[in-house]
Amino acid sequence: MIQLDGISKVYKIRSGYMKYHDLYALDNISTTFRNNIISGITGASGSGKTTLANIITGYDTDYAGQILYNNSPVRTAGYVRYVFQDPYISMNPVKTVEWHLATAASINNVEMSDAIKKLEIAGMDYSIYKDRYGHSLSGGELQKLALAISIIPEPEFIVLDEAFSMMDSITLFKTLNFLKQLKKTISIIYIDHDINRIAFASDYVYILNHGKIIEENYTDKIMNDPLNDFTKELIKYSPDYHRRI
């Protein structure tokens, strides 16, 4: 369980000569992300989704407030893993898939055979991909590789920040269904700007706007009976894939 207590992130923005004003990327966020569910976070661009992900995973430590991991302020090694938006940054283009797996396995003291299993269940055939270099993989393939690497150490939580944005619709559908199985052993925080993807995969949804969680509830409640006007707008102007099908 991850508990946020009064999390704020403020940037000083210059507004004139020797003048600055505060810009709240996150504004006093207090909530809980529970175990063994998919917690979906969505909202407008610039609403603070990635900033929140950076703080939860420890990549940004310059913030106000407190985070508790299983009721402790200390994040133990391996507790949470982060899958970034851009796999071209996180994956080495001149190293093979096998190298990426072996490196992750070595760092986390995991047998290579177990790392290969993670790649397979993430949807990549090791025998086909092991000798492929990073630069030869598509964006969607790199995103599957990044997902596989994130679960090699079997963390308690993974944070997925727009982690499937380069996948085709078939691969995306399979990956989101994979997450529904994965949550039985690894709790998931899934961030996406598309509320329909969030609704398809998530058990519980958080709506961010201007650095605040303006609404949170179980997915069916959010989609069928939203309370906040911004949430209603998000749903109204999002393509309804179910009706198209």
Where are these regions (language model features)?
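C-terminal boundary and immediately downstream tail of ABC-type ATPase nucleotide-binding domains
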Residues: 223-245
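A short, surface-exposed alpha-helical micro-motif characterized by mixed small hydrophobic
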Residues: 198-200
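Conserved ABC transporter NBD signature motif
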Residues: 64-78
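The feature captures the beta-strand-to-loop junction immediately N-terminal to the Walker
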Residues: 42-44
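Q-loop/switch helix immediately C-terminal to the Walker
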Residues: 86, 93-107
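Conserved ABC ATPase signature
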Residues: 133-137, 141
